[in-house]
A protein has these predicted regions:
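Catalytic domains of carbohydrate-active enzymes, especially glycoside hydrolases
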Residues: 3-14
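Extended active-site neighborhood of metal-dependent phosphoesterases/phosphodiesterases
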Residues: 5, 20-141, 154-178, 184-203
Length: 203
């Protein structure tokens, strides 16, 4: 809230895991109040929120996270992955929100803990990302996912290697400006040799 007062955000990009632990069971789950409504209650945060699913949401009812769009005025999640274009004083920005858990074998293969991950069509999403980025003509193109492609972390290397093999070639092909993610609970800004993409962890 205090930061909101200082910078006056236009909207919030929520890179997953609003609900930690086991996600939520429904749109009426009390965790919506304890994890979201009561925490982010400052007047400056009563603006549009554009979220994506994190791995913890995948432990619960992922459809309920999308359906909360019909409950909360500020929660705006039209699909598991989606895109919007913004124009501010002649500068255009395209943000592409993606669903990274289904792109990682660790989650796809653990059908007991993450039952919805294996049900998602990975090839369809990757083709959609490629198509959106092919058509993007904005001044800035930013992709938002929950999991990092590159990061210094003790978390499972396979998470990043799967994204390096499946997602990163598409981002590099289209020369996106930035990939923003969460998941590892710290801040990192990474540049890789041979790529002009800024890989930012902000969680």
């Amino acid at each position: 809230g205090k930061m909101g007062e200082e910078i006056g955000p236009e909207f919030v990009v929520a890179a997953g895991d609003i609900h930690h632990f086991e996600g939520v069971r429904s749109v009426n789950d009390p965790l919506w109040m304890t994890n979201y409504e009561l925490i982010y209650s400052h007047p400056e945060l009563m603006i549009d929120w554009y979220p994506i699913l994190g791995n913890h949401e995948y432990r619960g009812n992922t459809q309920a996270v999308l359906d909360y769009t019909n409950v909360s005025r500020r929660w705006s999640m039209p699909a598991r992955y989606y895109t919007k274009s913004f124009n501010e004083e002649g500068v255009t920005v395209r943000i592409v929100w993606i669903d990274t858990a289904p792109l990682i074998d660790k989650y796809r293969n653990d059908t007991q803990t993450y039952p919805d991950a294996c049900k998602q069509d990975m090839k369809k999403q990757l083709a959609w990302i490629d198509d959106v980025l092919t058509k993007a003509k904005e001044d800035w193109v930013i992709v938002v996912g929950h999991h990092p492609i590159y990061a210094e972390t003790s978390k499972d290397d396979s998470e990043r290697s799967d994204l390096q093999n499946r997602l990163d070639p598409i981002l590099r092909k289209h020369k996106v400006d930035m990939y923003v993610c969460g998941h590892i609970h710290n801040f990192q800004h990474i540049r890789m040799n041979g790529s002009n993409i800024d890989y930012v962890v902000n969680s």
